[in-house]
């Protein structure tokens, strides 16, 4: 596994990428920004490697993305209080966590 600086958030915090590669050369890239899966590179039938995931090459791309693309932890992770949420005028009850 390799770790490298990917970029910075809007408030200046470092974002790192973690690349994991297997023996055949396939690799994934993860970011510590929303637990983002940013890249999956696998071989095609001819053995040529290609990234098969729609991701971003820069932190600016990540910051401009408004739909949490690739993120396993969305924008409201650990931030819903009162065990409910309203979407498009409809109230939804959710299971209350330990602290929330």
Language-model region placement:
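Surface-exposed acidic/polar loop and edge beta-strand patches at domain peripheries
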Residues: 1-100
